[in-house]
Amino acid sequence: MKKQILRAVFLSFSLLFIGLANIAAQEGDSKAVAGGGVMVKGWTGKIDAKEQTAGLTLNSAKLSQDGKALHVTTGPATTYWNPKNVAKGDYTVSATFLEPKYMSLNDHPHPYGIVIGGSDLGTDQESYLYCAAYGNGTYIVRGFGPKPFQMGGRAPAKDDAVAKAAGVGQPVTQLIAVTVKGDKVSCSINNKVVATFDKSAVVAAGKLKSTDGVYGIRFAHNTDATVTGLKVTKAK
């Protein structure tokens, strides 16, 4: 009987180890970008705390300007913003994200998207919400307050509105927008609302301090894409 119990315990730990190993393999290590740093006037950024723990810095990712486009290459997962870009009241923040070569820096999809409600950015008390799309037809709505939190679940959600790349190395474009209007906060991708939340569920302990705040962009690790048309407009 004792041998059977020991076998069961051993099997359970073995399966747990394999599961954790698979998760680690899926997440992968962030690869520092050569010649990195923030090269767009007025902009700054912050990498995730776990990336800092791994010894990476803001210079391990790169934000540059190609004509009218912001060009981001990561590196560690990074959030970028210009402190002058502030949205208040009812508004929509939107931009177009182009991943010219899907999964060019990784072996699985990684997301990028819009940040809103930024407060105390760049500090250990920062808070913000972001809606981000993957080039495989899924999206997430998450944030920091200052610890990470998820809206609508941990796993990426599928929606037909989210564009899918034709294959690895192929281009994929996403128009992403976050709207604050009245008591609702919503995320739209390619002109379709894919998620809506009560503002009271977003502005809460451990989440946003307010939906008023700095807006910007966020990229997961090991991703390369451009951003055009980043703007704030009055919510309709």
Q: What are the language-model segments listed below?
A:
Residues 95, 228-232:
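Extracellular beta-strand elements of beta-rich domains used
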Residues 197-228:
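Flexible glycan-contacting loops in extracellular carbohydrate-active proteins
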Residues 9-21:
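Bacterial N-terminal signal peptides
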Residues 1-10:
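Bacterial N-terminal signal peptides that target proteins for export
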Residues 26-104:
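Low-complexity, Ser/Thr/Pro/Gly-rich disordered linker/stalk regions
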Residues 149-175:
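Short, aromatic/His-centered strand-loop micro-motif at the edge of beta-sheets
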Residues 95, 169-201:
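Carbohydrate-binding surfaces in secreted/extracellular proteins
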Residues 74-150:
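Secretory/extracellular carbohydrate-interaction modules
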